[in-house]
From Swiss-Prot:
Residues recorded with modification Phosphothreonine: 152, 210
Known outcome of mutating residue 152 to A: Lack of phosphorylation. Attenuates growth in macrophages and in mice
Transmembrane segments: 614-634, 652-672, 700-720, 740-760, 767-787, 836-856
Low complexity composition-biased segments: 135-156
Feature: compositional bias, Pro residues: 157-166
Highest taxon of source: Bacteria
Enzyme class: translocase
Name of this protein: ABC transporter ATP-binding/permease protein Rv1747
GO BP terms: transmembrane transport
Binding-site residues for ATP, renumbered to this chain: 352-359
Impact when changing residue 248 to A: Strong decrease in phosphorylation. Decreases interaction with PknF
Domain comment as written in the entry: In Rv1747 the ATP-binding domain (NBD) and the transmembrane domain (TMD) are fused. The two FHA domains are required for phosphorylation by PknF.
Domain (ABC transporter): residue spans on this chain: 319-552
Organism expressing this protein natively: Mycobacterium tuberculosis (strain ATCC 25618 / H37Rv)
Length: 865
């Protein structure tokens, strides 16, 4: 009789606000506000590691992890709760966030904190894949989760004695637990059976929004790969799986060769970097740092392992600004020997009077400009020498909102996710990332709200959400509270505090001084970029002698050199700045294919037009209005021969003038406000990978279609009301079709002119004057109302306007010279009723369109810093 197998421990399913996670026994489950928690509860009453769930002595228990606001059962605060099926507990207060438990019935995959192990690359001479064995478990370092009693210890009814586990403060990472002397390790949970296909979605263990790195169980090699090759990527069929939003599904391959281990990039979108340089293939040597997305892996002794954030050379993953000086024009110093250290979890405010270089420092730290002296390092990398590999780790939120106001929060973030995430991410992946980002920012309830209907603080959160899509670990904000009232100011600063508490380095440039107490440190700059103070906000009063900011700013502004001297006297002389490394090429931002970007921008542009109801109604009515105006021309012959002695001797010419001016006005009005209206948005998207070419082509195509539709409406109205051309077509088969082409191409060329004017404009206030000048000048240069042929310089100036060639093409189509002979019609060779004249007019319209688009492409190009 076969022996019965012991029953497997029951799994635990945790439900919170509609989300569901399932965990297997054997590992503590962390519930808290921290982004790295297994069950994240984004609530101000919840501690970073609030609650521990553990399977012990045949049952699941919930343990209060020394939280400030406690664990509640039946309205009573308790230290420990025995969990049973269908039980509910509250955390934070008796009416706080509710957790519902289900024990033993869920069949999906089980999430858990990962264990640690190294992956040793197989020896090429072996020629075979190594046999699977039990994963090696890394040792626990001090100050980490090992302080909790082991899982085999019975949980007492009273609060557990001794120190309880907490997430480390500062720069320590939640997992893997590590000590300063331990070799770098790679994360991999124990092998588990794959879940059913239908159960995968609800139990995903990784937090894509914060780019937590977990290496999952090894899979089998597929495809034709050399013996011993190791595949790296986001998909579960890789040997090393990185659930990192910037990693491609099959990102890179490690291949043993006679010369050593080689890493080969699999044409990934965001690239593979070795020691900060992007490579297609490279031989690895001990100590080489391989960067994939936001993850650093170290190659040592034939082993690929994650780089430890707490090693000395990596500066605990923080930001180090050392002796940074920036001088322009040879002798004008904007930043003067600034030094600053910010660890993960720290919120740093940069303040100072106008002209102190606050925004300049932010741009320099973000890598947009490089220092004259000194260095900026982040997570062990020189920002300016290795910028290409760090670009995705740095999120920059400019002062202007970078979210389209006409879109809902969901649509804005989904389009941004399409542009920023690798092309092999599915819609479900992007939806999950967006949902988690909004949850972190407490914006989930506003997901279907139009951005322009949000409050100022909520709009700033939406701008921050765009940056969090790719999981940056350094977030820089320039004047996020500008123009906000005190209540919204507090909301924004509280949000920044929470973002820092999640383990990021947050640097905020601000003029608002009311809520600096939420910051960990304050950097006060004097004019000329000189440091006047750097330290906790509680020390400002004792050090500066007053807490009156007006007096402080006045003092440092009156004598910046003295302010810096007093600072150095307090802190001691700063060490000499390290030598400046040669700035590397910025490299092209990682971007998806042109077609994918084109598709995304085109779909977004259409939604923007339709969502702006007032603008959309105006565009829809405009062709009907212009068509009706054309009907106001007196006479009843249309494009026939008018009576020279009648009331309308130039009826055909007047109809063409109104058609031509209507086409010019429709096209220019269609696009003139487009580029200036989203310039800040485009600049940020361009910096993170949006192709200027794809962006411009998408807009050209969308507006071309709209211009053609508008032209069709106008032309049909005129043809119905006045009749079609009577002299036959000169180039196309039908004169009515040819007249439509005349109007449509003129409208399209005018739309391209509108884009050019929008690229030139400095502000939205300049749009209306530019539109008026453009339309009125082309009314003159068309030649239909005021003769320009042979008149210097009107004739020459008219050659660069669409109206000149649009009117000439339509005049050639209807044979205006024949219909209205004599002094009313100038002898213009471009109006002749011949195919050569018509094709020349069309060619000029197309050429002008290309010139306008080329100018716009040059104007909005990505400029090197």
């Amino acid at each position: 009789m076969p022996m019965s197998q012991p029953a497997a421990p029951p799994v635990l399913t945790v439900r919170y606000e509609g989300s569901e996670r399932t965990f297997a026994a054997g590992h503590d489950v962390v519930v808290g506000r921290d982004l790295r928690a297994d069950v994240r509860v984004a609530h101000p009453l919840i501690s970073r590691a609030h609650l521990l769930l553990r399977f012990d002595q045949g049952r699941w228990v919930a343990i209060d992890n020394g939280s400030l606001n406690g664990l509640y059962l039946n309205n009573r605060r308790v230290p420990v709760v025995d969990i049973y099926d269908a039980q509910r507990v509250h955390i934070g207060n008796p009416d706080g966030p509710a957790l519902d438990f289900e024990v033993g019935r869920h069949r999906g995959s089980a999430g858990r904190p990962p264990q640690t192990t190294s992956i040793r690359l197989p020896n090429l001479s072996a020629g075979a894949w190594p046999t699977d064995g039990p994963p090696q478990t890394g040792t626990l370092g001090s100050g980490q989760l090992q302080q909790l009693p082991p899982a085999t210890t019975r949980i007492p009814a009273a609060p557990p004695s001794g120190p309880q586990p907490r997430y480390p403060t500062g720069g320590q990472q939640l997992w893997p637990p590590s000590g300063p002397q331990r070799a770098p390790q790679i994360y991999r949970p124990p092998t588990a059976a794959p879940p059913p296909a239908g159960a995968r979605g609800g139990t995903e263990a990784g937090n894509l929004a914060t780019s937590m790195m977990k290496i999952l169980r090894p899979g089998r090699l597929t495809g034709e790969l050399p013996p011993g090759a190791v595949r790296i990527g986001r998909a579960n069929d890789n040997d090393i799986v990185i659930p990192e939003v910037l990693a491609s599904r099959h990102h890179a391959t490690l291949v043993p060769t006679p010369g050593g281990t080689e890493i080969r990039d699999n044409r990934s979108i965001n690239g593979t970097f070795v020691n900060g340089a992007r490579v297609d293939a490279a031989l690895l040597h001990d100590g080489d740092v391989v960067t994939i997305g936001n993850i650093d892996l170290v190659f040592a002794d034939g082993t690929l392992a994650r780089r430890e954030e707490n090693l000395l050379e990596t500066r605990v993953g923080g930001l180090d600004v050392r002796g940074v000086t920036w001088t322009i024009d040879g002798d004008k110093t904007l930043l003067d020997g600034i030094s600053l250290t910010a660890r993960p979890g720290m919120l740093t405010a940069v303040i100072g009077p106008s002209g102190a270089g606050k925004s300049t420092l932010a741009r320099l730290v973000a890598g947009y400009t490089h220092p004259t002296d000194g260095t900026v390092t982040f997570e062990g990398h020189n920002v300016h020498a290795e910028y290409a590999s760090l670009r995705s780790r740095i999120g920059m939120v400019p002062q202007d909102d970078v979210v389209h106001g006409q879109l809902t929060v969901k649509h804005a973030l989904m389009y941004a996710a399409e542009l920023r995430l690798p092309p092999d991410t599915t819609k479900d992946d992007r939806t999950q990332v967006v949902a988690r980002v909004l949850e972190e920012l407490e914006m989930s309830k506003h997901i279907d709200t139009r951005v322009d209907k949000l409050s100022g603080g909520q709009r700033k959160r939406a701008s921050v959400a765009l940056e969090l899509l790719t999981g940056p670990s350094l977030l820089i904000l320039d004047e996020p509270t500008s123009g906000l009232d005190p209540a919204l100011d507090r909301q924004v600063m509280t949000m920044l505090r929470q973002l820092a508490d999640a383990g990021r380095v947050v640097l905020v440039v601000t003029h608002s001084l009311t809520y600096l107490d939420v910051c960990d440190q304050v950097l006060l700059l004097a004019p000329g970029g000189k440091t006047a103070f750097c330290g906790p906000p509680t020390q400002i009063g004792p050090v500066m002698g007053t807490t009156n900011w007006a007096d402080i700013f006045s003092t440092v502004a009156d004598d910046p050199d003295a302010a810096k001297a007093r600072y150095l006297a307090r802190t001691g002389p700063t060490p000499p700045p390290p030598p400046v490394e040669q700035p590397a090429e910025l490299g092209d931002p990682a971007h998806t294919s042109l077609f994918r970007q084109f598709s995304t921008i085109a779909r977004r542009q259409l939604r923007l037009i339709v969502s702006d109801r007032g603008y959309f109604v105006f565009l829809a009515l405009l062709p009907f209005i212009m068509g009706a105006l054309s009907m106001s021309v007196p006479g009843d012959v249309g494009f026939g021969f008018p009576n020279p002695m009648g009331d309308a001797p130039n009826e055909p010419g007047q109809i063409l003038v109104l058609l031509n001016v209507g086409a010019v006005f429709m096209g220019t009005a269609l696009t003139i406000r487009d580029l200036i209206g989203e310039r800040a948005i485009f600049r940020r998207e361009q910096a993170v990978g949006l192709s200027t070419t794809a962006y411009l082509i998408a807009k050209v195509c969308v507006y071309t279609v709209l211009a053609v539709v508008q032209s069709a409406i106008v032309t049909v109205i005129v043809l119905v009301g006045k009749g079609g051309p009577t002299q036959g077509a000169v180039a196309l088969s039908k004169p009515d079709l040819e007249l439509f082409v005349d109007v449509a191409v003129t409208c399209v060329a005018s739309a391209m002119l509108g884009l050019a004017l929008s690229a030139i404009a400095k502000s939205n206030e300049q749009i209306m004057p530019l539109l008026v000048v453009a339309v009125m000048s082309q009314l003159v240069f068309s030649g239909g109302m005021i003769p320009v042929t042979g008149r210097v310089p009107l004739d020459q100036m008219s050659w660069v306007t669409p109206a000149r060639w649009g009117f000439a093409a339509s005049a050639a189509t209807v044979d205006l010279i024949k219909l209205v002979p004599g002094p009313l019609t100038p002898k213009d060779s471009h109006w002749h009723h011949t195919a050569s004249a018509w094709w020349f007019d069309m060619a000029m319209l197309v050429a002008l369109s290309v010139i306008y688009v080329g100018f716009v492409r040059w104007k909005i190009r990505l400029k090197a810093c």
